[in-house]
């Protein structure tokens, strides 16, 4: 089936997508409201409604980076133009120094060609419908690939097994000076991560090609065309011999899109099963799913330390966590001076006490065996778990009873300390 894409829609969504990838907002709806309100205000000030114009950053060019700085990354020409790096999240720090990159005005009167591509529903695909693709690599190649991928935002939320599948599936592509890696208007076939080399970004405007930026030994491009079935928005040309790591379209969508969809669905079910979150509305629980991250700890690894400032709240997804506490000024029975006061298993949570009382951590937590936890930062905790706060505060009485039984005192876990 061929679907006619309204003029300007692709550019609008691409610009919004990159803004989300750059800023990682905890509240996506609020961020979208602010983003599109800003666009509308900019258009009103200019006296025209150019919905294809994203006034601060260009989605296919990634975050503006370099801007004349000698650091490696993506650099954009002073005159803003349309480009196709489609990513560049890893250049976000450079973007803060270089300033925002202004996007070009898209001609909304030019009719957009229809886009016909396969539909992809991650829920309909069987788990093993596709055989796993493995491109053998030497230890040196794998190390270089891991280094090149470590700051790519698309891979940030993949667990170790998923990341291993991505690394296995990626293939090395050597390029010569002057070679076109992708061409504007072509269908997207691969996602690319730069290992080494310099590349220019060219965009045709009114039939004339212009260089709008470049990559210097770092960066990635090509994911938006794969995610949204849109043609390439620019041409990427090698300006020196170099090497890229490629990930094919099918593997990209299967691993990145499908696994993210599966993980969201799994976390939705898990969050819904937690009794202390029952007081949240469905929409509030979905917001929790959006902001939680996964952390894996090895046997004996410390998760939180007594006395540290609180920055996260944890829910045990799998494994067991030991909670220990040191009595003030007195060594207890264990060699490390701490006594075990509780254990947490799947569905139980810890780390909330310091967030509720605004005090340093009252206890330490260590992994028993391999432990996987869902973690939520303090800002999201305060914003999203307000309805659950009374339940958590009621637990303080239970904690105090445990401490009195163990130490003969409640350890002042509630009263403010200096």
Curated annotation (Swiss-Prot):
Entry protein name: cAMP-dependent protein kinase type II-beta regulatory subunit
Function: Regulatory subunit of the cAMP-dependent protein kinases involved in cAMP signaling in cells. Type II regulatory chains mediate membrane association by binding to anchoring proteins, including the MAP2 kinase.
Region (Disordered) location: 45-98
GO MF terms held by the record: cAMP binding; cAMP-dependent protein kinase inhibitor activity; protein kinase A catalytic subunit binding
Processing after translation: Phosphorylated by the activated catalytic chain.
Basic and acidic residues composition-biased segments: 45-57
Gene responsible for this protein: PRKAR2B
Start-end of Acidic residues biased regions: 86-96
Quaternary structure note: The inactive form of the enzyme is composed of two regulatory chains and two catalytic chains. Activation by cAMP produces two active catalytic monomers and a regulatory dimer that binds four cAMP molecules. Interacts with PRKACA and PRKACB. Interacts with the phosphorylated form of PJA2. Forms a complex composed of PRKAR2B, GSK3B and GSKIP through GSKIP interaction; facilitates PKA-induced phosphorylation and regulates GSK3B activity.
Top-level lineage group: Eukaryota
Residues bearing PTM Phosphothreonine: 69
Phylogenetic classification of the source organism: Eukaryota, Metazoa, Chordata, Craniata, Vertebrata
